[in-house]
Amino acid sequence: MPTAISRSRVWSVLTTPAAIPQTGPRLKTNLDTDLLKLIAIAAMLIDHIGGAFFPEVGVFRWIGRLAFPIFCYCLTVGLLYTHDVRKYLTRLGIFALVSQPFYILAFHPVGEFWANLTNWNIFFTLFLSLLGMYGLKERKWWLFALALFTVSWWNFDYSGTGIQLMLIFYLCRNRPRLGAALYLLSYLPALMNGW
Protein backbone atom coordinates (compact mmCIF):
# COMPACT_ATOMS: atom_id res chain seq x y z
CA MET A 1 0.00 0.00 0.00
CA PRO A 2 1.48 3.38 -1.00
CA THR A 3 2.39 5.73 1.80
CA ALA A 4 0.93 9.20 2.04
CA ILE A 5 3.29 11.96 1.02
CA SER A 6 2.83 15.35 2.62
CA ARG A 7 2.43 18.48 0.54
CA SER A 8 5.45 20.04 2.18
CA ARG A 9 7.62 17.07 1.17
CA VAL A 10 6.41 17.27 -2.45
CA TRP A 11 7.00 21.04 -2.49
CA SER A 12 10.47 20.53 -1.03
CA VAL A 13 11.38 18.00 -3.71
CA LEU A 14 10.06 20.25 -6.49
CA THR A 15 11.76 23.42 -5.31
CA THR A 16 15.12 22.09 -4.11
CA PRO A 17 17.78 22.38 -6.80
CA ALA A 18 19.37 19.19 -8.00
CA ALA A 19 22.95 18.55 -7.00
CA ILE A 20 25.26 19.51 -9.84
CA PRO A 21 28.82 18.19 -9.83
CA GLN A 22 30.25 21.49 -11.13
CA THR A 23 31.82 24.22 -9.08
CA GLY A 24 30.61 27.80 -9.09
CA PRO A 25 27.38 29.60 -8.29
CA ARG A 26 24.17 27.61 -8.18
CA LEU A 27 20.82 28.50 -9.63
CA LYS A 28 17.64 27.53 -7.84
CA THR A 29 15.87 27.03 -11.16
CA ASN A 30 15.64 24.48 -13.94
CA LEU A 31 18.95 24.32 -15.77
CA ASP A 32 17.61 22.42 -18.76
CA THR A 33 17.19 25.36 -21.11
CA ASP A 34 16.42 23.34 -24.24
CA LEU A 35 12.65 23.78 -23.87
CA LEU A 36 13.11 27.48 -23.16
CA LYS A 37 15.21 27.84 -26.31
CA LEU A 38 12.47 26.19 -28.38
CA ILE A 39 9.87 28.54 -26.89
CA ALA A 40 12.10 31.53 -27.65
CA ILE A 41 12.70 30.36 -31.23
CA ALA A 42 8.95 29.86 -31.75
CA ALA A 43 8.22 33.33 -30.33
CA MET A 44 10.91 34.86 -32.54
CA LEU A 45 9.52 33.09 -35.61
CA ILE A 46 6.00 34.35 -34.84
CA ASP A 47 7.42 37.86 -34.41
CA HIS A 48 9.24 37.74 -37.75
CA ILE A 49 6.24 36.32 -39.60
CA GLY A 50 4.06 39.04 -38.08
CA GLY A 51 6.56 41.77 -38.93
CA ALA A 52 6.96 40.60 -42.52
CA PHE A 53 3.41 39.60 -43.47
CA PHE A 54 1.02 41.06 -40.87
CA PRO A 55 2.58 44.30 -39.58
CA GLU A 56 -0.81 45.70 -38.56
CA VAL A 57 -1.53 42.76 -36.21
CA GLY A 58 0.19 43.65 -32.94
CA VAL A 59 -0.26 40.29 -31.22
CA PHE A 60 2.48 38.76 -33.38
CA ARG A 61 4.94 41.39 -32.16
CA TRP A 62 3.89 40.98 -28.52
CA ILE A 63 4.43 37.23 -28.66
CA GLY A 64 7.79 37.86 -30.26
CA ARG A 65 8.89 40.06 -27.37
CA LEU A 66 9.07 36.95 -25.19
CA ALA A 67 12.07 35.68 -27.15
CA PHE A 68 14.71 38.21 -26.13
CA PRO A 69 14.49 37.84 -22.32
CA ILE A 70 14.36 34.05 -22.68
CA PHE A 71 17.51 34.09 -24.81
CA CYS A 72 19.18 36.37 -22.24
CA TYR A 73 18.27 33.95 -19.45
CA CYS A 74 19.61 30.97 -21.42
CA LEU A 75 22.86 32.82 -22.11
CA THR A 76 23.22 33.65 -18.42
CA VAL A 77 22.76 30.00 -17.48
CA GLY A 78 25.22 29.05 -20.21
CA LEU A 79 27.75 31.55 -18.86
CA LEU A 80 27.50 30.04 -15.40
CA TYR A 81 27.81 26.42 -16.48
CA THR A 82 29.84 26.32 -19.69
CA HIS A 83 33.28 24.74 -19.58
CA ASP A 84 34.78 27.23 -22.05
CA VAL A 85 33.28 30.72 -22.32
CA ARG A 86 35.63 31.63 -25.16
CA LYS A 87 34.26 28.85 -27.36
CA TYR A 88 30.74 29.89 -26.38
CA LEU A 89 31.49 33.50 -27.38
CA THR A 90 33.19 32.38 -30.61
CA ARG A 91 30.16 30.34 -31.73
CA LEU A 92 27.78 33.18 -30.92
CA GLY A 93 30.03 35.70 -32.70
CA ILE A 94 30.29 33.54 -35.83
CA PHE A 95 26.51 33.13 -35.91
CA ALA A 96 26.10 36.91 -35.53
CA LEU A 97 28.45 37.54 -38.47
CA VAL A 98 26.85 34.91 -40.72
CA SER A 99 23.31 36.11 -40.00
CA GLN A 100 24.05 39.85 -40.48
CA PRO A 101 23.58 39.99 -44.29
CA PHE A 102 20.29 38.05 -44.04
CA TYR A 103 19.12 40.37 -41.25
CA ILE A 104 19.82 43.43 -43.41
CA LEU A 105 18.08 41.93 -46.45
CA ALA A 106 15.03 40.87 -44.42
CA PHE A 107 14.45 43.90 -42.22
CA HIS A 108 15.86 46.95 -43.99
CA PRO A 109 14.88 48.73 -47.22
CA VAL A 110 15.86 47.08 -50.48
CA GLY A 111 18.75 48.79 -52.21
CA GLU A 112 20.23 50.16 -48.99
CA PHE A 113 22.28 47.10 -48.02
CA TRP A 114 25.56 48.97 -47.47
CA ALA A 115 23.89 51.89 -45.69
CA ASN A 116 22.34 49.47 -43.19
CA LEU A 117 25.46 47.39 -42.63
CA THR A 118 25.92 48.91 -39.17
CA ASN A 119 22.38 48.13 -38.00
CA TRP A 120 23.56 45.20 -35.90
CA ASN A 121 21.30 42.17 -35.45
CA ILE A 122 20.17 40.71 -32.15
CA PHE A 123 22.97 38.15 -32.07
CA PHE A 124 25.57 40.92 -31.85
CA THR A 125 23.64 42.32 -28.89
CA LEU A 126 23.59 38.89 -27.26
CA PHE A 127 27.30 38.41 -28.04
CA LEU A 128 28.27 41.71 -26.42
CA SER A 129 25.94 41.07 -23.48
CA LEU A 130 27.56 37.69 -22.89
CA LEU A 131 31.01 39.26 -23.24
CA GLY A 132 30.09 41.95 -20.71
CA MET A 133 28.70 39.45 -18.24
CA TYR A 134 31.83 37.33 -18.65
CA GLY A 135 33.85 40.43 -17.78
CA LEU A 136 31.69 40.99 -14.70
CA LYS A 137 31.95 37.36 -13.60
CA GLU A 138 35.73 37.32 -13.99
CA ARG A 139 36.08 40.84 -12.51
CA LYS A 140 37.47 42.21 -15.75
CA TRP A 141 35.65 45.52 -15.37
CA TRP A 142 37.07 47.01 -18.56
CA LEU A 143 35.44 44.21 -20.57
CA PHE A 144 32.06 44.85 -18.95
CA ALA A 145 32.39 48.61 -19.54
CA LEU A 146 33.47 48.10 -23.16
CA ALA A 147 30.50 45.83 -23.92
CA LEU A 148 28.04 48.17 -22.20
CA PHE A 149 29.43 51.21 -24.02
CA THR A 150 29.41 49.45 -27.40
CA VAL A 151 25.79 48.24 -27.28
CA SER A 152 24.60 51.55 -25.88
CA TRP A 153 26.47 53.77 -28.34
CA TRP A 154 25.97 52.05 -31.70
CA ASN A 155 22.83 50.82 -33.43
CA PHE A 156 22.24 47.39 -31.88
CA ASP A 157 18.87 45.67 -31.54
CA TYR A 158 17.61 46.19 -27.97
CA SER A 159 20.76 48.28 -27.23
CA GLY A 160 21.78 48.01 -23.55
CA THR A 161 18.74 45.97 -22.55
CA GLY A 162 20.62 42.72 -23.24
CA ILE A 163 23.30 43.49 -20.69
CA GLN A 164 20.68 44.85 -18.31
CA LEU A 165 18.58 41.67 -18.44
CA MET A 166 21.59 39.38 -18.19
CA LEU A 167 22.83 41.42 -15.23
CA ILE A 168 19.46 40.96 -13.50
CA PHE A 169 19.44 37.22 -14.24
CA TYR A 170 23.04 36.85 -13.07
CA LEU A 171 22.83 38.88 -9.86
CA CYS A 172 19.39 37.54 -8.90
CA ARG A 173 20.06 33.93 -9.89
CA ASN A 174 19.20 32.71 -6.38
CA ARG A 175 16.59 35.38 -5.68
CA PRO A 176 13.84 34.76 -8.25
CA ARG A 177 11.30 37.16 -6.72
CA LEU A 178 13.75 40.04 -6.72
CA GLY A 179 14.80 39.13 -10.25
CA ALA A 180 11.18 39.08 -11.42
CA ALA A 181 10.51 42.48 -9.83
CA LEU A 182 13.62 44.02 -11.41
CA TYR A 183 12.71 42.46 -14.75
CA LEU A 184 9.22 43.96 -14.63
CA LEU A 185 10.60 47.37 -13.67
CA SER A 186 13.25 47.37 -16.38
CA TYR A 187 11.96 45.54 -19.45
CA LEU A 188 8.19 45.89 -19.48
CA PRO A 189 8.08 49.73 -19.56
CA ALA A 190 10.11 49.59 -22.77
CA LEU A 191 7.53 47.21 -24.24
CA MET A 192 4.68 49.48 -23.20
CA ASN A 193 6.33 52.31 -25.14
CA GLY A 194 6.14 50.29 -28.35
CA TRP A 195 9.60 48.77 -28.41
Residue ranges and their predicted role:
Residues 4-195:
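Alpha-helical transmembrane segments and their immediate juxtamembrane cytosolic regions
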